């Protein structure tokens, strides 16, 4: 919360414009994801800089060259989306939990990206989201979904991954891109405004041919293991030139 206040204070003269512009992007009829994403990326970089947050990205070259893939990162908190929005060079949308639908700025950003809200307590609605994401990925949209289903409150430790979150990838036969977030909980969860560095590692994609014979819980375990290994490896680095 302290860092959010810092961001707002340091950008107070721009915040009204940012909010109005993002709101407008999400409501106009001629939806243009690339233009929306470019502006939101610009705002995100400004907010992170104002909040004294540095993003280090690794493995950007692992992002598939062709659209129609899904990012599967670990989930540490509300700042996670801002890490990807600054770091990722290609537009993507997000599947987010319904509970954050009314968080200021986030809801405007999600609307501008045509993100999809999922109600974890409503099985029927969850299935509809899976089906919708499947069809949109087939059409070349990129998505991000958190396979833990909720954020871990144990720092860089992961919660169990839910196999059901991988159903869209299996049905769309698309690349699965595991992503490891390190210290993404610190900017918003710690009561501090001291400079902080967050790392994001894009791991090599898992192509459909590699997982088509596996059940979704098995895929979930493989992705979780890859992310845990990346967190252990990159957490030990004092400094590595990011990609």
Task: Please tell me what each predicted stretch does.
Residues 75-77, 148-152:
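Short glycine-rich anion-binding loops that position phosphate/pyrophosphate groups of nucleotides
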Residues 72, 109, 133-135, 191-194:
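Short low-complexity, flexible loop/linker segments enriched in glycine and/or proline
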Residues 68-70, 142-146:
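Residue-level preference for the first positions of well-ordered beta-strands
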Residues 17-18, 22-24, 36, 50-51, ...:
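Catalytic core of membrane glycerolipid acyltransferases/transacylases, capturing the structured
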Residues 1-69:
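Membrane-anchoring hydrophobic helices of lipid-metabolizing enzymes
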Residues 57, 71, 94-95, 200-202:
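Generic preference for hydrophobic
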Residues 105-107, 142-144, 153-218:
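A cross-family acyltransferase "interaction/gating" segment
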Residues 239-243:
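Conserved small/polar residues in nucleotide/adenosyl-binding loops
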């Amino acid at each position: 919360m302290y860092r959010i206040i810092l961001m707002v204070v340091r950008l107070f003269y721009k915040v009204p414009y940012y909010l109005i512009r993002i709101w407008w992007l999400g409501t106009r009829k001629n939806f243009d994801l690339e233009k929306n994403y470019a502006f939101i990326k610009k705002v995100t970089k400004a907010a992170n800089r104002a909040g004294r947050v540095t993003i280090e990205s690794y493995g950007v070259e692992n992002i598939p060259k062709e659209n129609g893939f899904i990012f599967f990162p670990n989930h540490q908190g509300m700042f996670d989306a801002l890490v990807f929005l600054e770091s990722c060079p290609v537009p993507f949308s997000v599947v987010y939990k319904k509970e954050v639908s009314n968080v200021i700025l986030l809801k405007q950003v999600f609307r501008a990206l045509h993100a999809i809200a999922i109600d974890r307590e409503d099985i029927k609605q969850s299935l509809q989201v899976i089906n919708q994401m499947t069809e949109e990925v087939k059409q070349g949209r990129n998505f991000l979904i958190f396979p833990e289903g909720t954020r871990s409150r144990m720092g860089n430790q992961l919660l169990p991954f839910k196999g059901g979150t991988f159903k869209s990838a299996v049905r769309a036969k698309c690349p699965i891109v595991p992503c490891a977030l390190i210290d993404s909980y610190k900017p918003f969860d710690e009561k501090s405004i001291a400079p902080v560095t967050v790392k994001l590692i894009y791991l090599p994609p898992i192509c459909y041919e590699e997982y088509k014979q596996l059940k979704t819980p098995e895929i979930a375990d493989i992705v979780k293991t890859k992310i845990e290994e990346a967190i252990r490896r990159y957490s030990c680095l004092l400094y590595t030139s990011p990609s």
